[in-house]
């Protein structure tokens, strides 16, 4: 988001560092914290579809406010150390696709191919017409990250295949558009029309835009005092005070990567608008937006890394599409458009074994698909477990909910809820059916050090799956 950076966190974090008390050296030490994420395929391959982990809403040195407000040098060259941090973070967190969404200042001023920031052995990906639509970076461990180009201003076009049409000034005007004409221009450029910061967008605007998808969660919204107060109905300063505790570098400090536990909460206005549009019969996938700029907390935390490092933010959560080839940007975009995706707050744990499907006779329906009403189907939710959970740690509590948004009334009903290992629900009435999982992350309590385990005793949103539809 361009309105303001998160730099106002710095003072709070510095104060916490100065005031933090020393820890108890006798406290039990938990197993080492994993600063990375596993290959997405460890979540489980189902019916020939592999999960591909993606970041949707990500800023590079081609956003004017990235990299502590210094994304380019005096000669216009990108901030190479900041770019290197981004590239290393994508490798450490095993991101399969990085949907860059830079602000029009300065993204609109550059040739499209320049925006991929290809370095070293990166390879271009072209379409049938020879246009570069993506690039691939191979990490030291052989993992491949696919980059695509988009923008984030009032709207958020993603996975463009070329710049929108017109002169440089016309590009700026279109990227800053917020009407149906802008949406049409994004699609004409081969992209998807997404909406970031759903919490602040009027429902009338969303109806008129008819976007391809929206954010159901945005990190910046959960932290910014103004957004919390004006749009989320949350205490404006609560997130800052709580998150500042994780800047402690004294013995007994909490694991810095768990700072998100201090402010993670549902973006309820975004969820309500999603339900409203689903109740009107729209098909609408959702993502969670990292909104990462590496421009907010330059002070080092106890792990020696700045508080808002790309690696830390990308470690917190991502979006998973189900595809036959995780390296194919066309397949990824098709899955995004179709709604074959779900979001995961991976700071709470990587879910292994999750499967959401509907079955009717020999036919299986995936997320985003339409089930004929006359046919009916059985929705099955196989609840996941937390990957690699050390037996010495407390056991988390995982709960799934099946939510029906009826069309055309818009009535929202919880059809089933439980801790598993499986839920089965018949889908017969028209509407959208979505699955949401929450977790009480008790296994993280020992990593909270002198803060104590209270933050790990709260029920937190873990997974939002895009709906299936009965029509």
Question: What function would you assign to each model-found segment?
Answer:
Residues 25-51, 63, 102-108, 275-471:
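C-terminal functional module detector
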Residues 214, 250-253, 334:
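Catalytic pocket-lining loop regions of alpha/beta-barrel enzymes
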Residues 30-238, 255, 265-269, 273, ...:
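A metal-dependent hydrolase metal-coordination microenvironment
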Residues 242-243:
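Acidic/polar low-complexity surface segments
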Residues 19-21:
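C-terminal motif of bacterial Sec signal peptides marking the signal peptidase cleavage site
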Residues 1-12:
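Bacterial N-terminal signal peptides that target proteins for export
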């Amino acid at each position: 988001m361009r309105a303001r950076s998160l730099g106002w966190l710095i003072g709070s974090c510095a104060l916490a560092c100065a005031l933090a008390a020393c820890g108890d050296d006798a406290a039990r030490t938990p197993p080492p914290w994993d600063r990375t994420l596993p290959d997405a395929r460890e979540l489980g391959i189902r019916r020939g579809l592999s999960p591909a982990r993606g970041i949707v809403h990500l800023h590079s040195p081609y956003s004017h406010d990235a990299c502590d407000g210094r994304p380019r040098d005096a000669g216009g060259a990108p901030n190479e150390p900041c770019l290197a941090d981004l590239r290393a973070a994508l490798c450490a967190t095993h991101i399969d696709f990085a949907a860059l969404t830079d602000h029009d200042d300065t993204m609109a001023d550059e040739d499209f191919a320049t925006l991929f920031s290809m370095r070293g052995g990166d390879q271009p990906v072209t379409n049938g017409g020879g246009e570069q639509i993506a690039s691939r970076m191979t990490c030291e461990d052989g993992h491949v990250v696919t980059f695509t180009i988009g923008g984030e201003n009032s709207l958020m076009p993603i996975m463009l295949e070329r710049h929108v049409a017109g002169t440089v000034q016309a590009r700026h005007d279109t990227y800053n558009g917020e009407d149906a004409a802008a949406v049409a221009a994004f699609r004409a450029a081969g992209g998807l029309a997404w909406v970031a910061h759903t919490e602040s967008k009027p429902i009338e605007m969303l109806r008129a835009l008819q976007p391809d998808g929206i954010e159901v969660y945005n990190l910046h919204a959960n932290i910014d005092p103004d957004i919390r107060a004006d749009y989320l109905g949350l205490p404006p300063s609560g997130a800052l005070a709580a998150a500042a505790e994780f800047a402690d570098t004294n013995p007994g400090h909490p694991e810095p990567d768990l700072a998100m536990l201090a402010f993670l909460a549902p973006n309820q206005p975004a969820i309500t608008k999603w339900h409203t549009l689903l109740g009107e019969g729209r098909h609408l996938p959702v993502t969670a937006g990292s909104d990462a700029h590496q421009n907010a907390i330059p002070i080092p935390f106890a792990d020696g890394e700045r508080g808002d490092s790309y690696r830390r933010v990308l470690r917190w959560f991502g979006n998973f599409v189900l595809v036959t080839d995780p390296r194919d940007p066309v397949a990824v975009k098709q899955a995004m458009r179709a709604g074959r995706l779900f979001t995961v707050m991976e700071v709470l744990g990587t879910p292994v074994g999750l499967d959401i499907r509907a079955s009717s006779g020999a036919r299986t329906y995936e997320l985003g698909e339409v089930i004929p009403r006359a046919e009916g189907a059985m929705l099955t939710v196989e609840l996941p477990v937390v990957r690699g959970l050390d037996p010495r740690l407390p056991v988390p509590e995982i709960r799934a909910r099946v939510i029906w948004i009826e069309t055309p009334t818009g009535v929202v009903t919880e059809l089933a809820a439980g801790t598993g290992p499986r839920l089965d629900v018949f889908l017969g009435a028209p509407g959208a059916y979505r699955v949401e999982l929450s977790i009480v992350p008790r296994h993280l309590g020992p990593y909270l050090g002198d803060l104590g385990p209270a933050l790990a005793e709260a029920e937190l949103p873990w997974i939002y799956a895009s709906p299936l539809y009965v029509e």
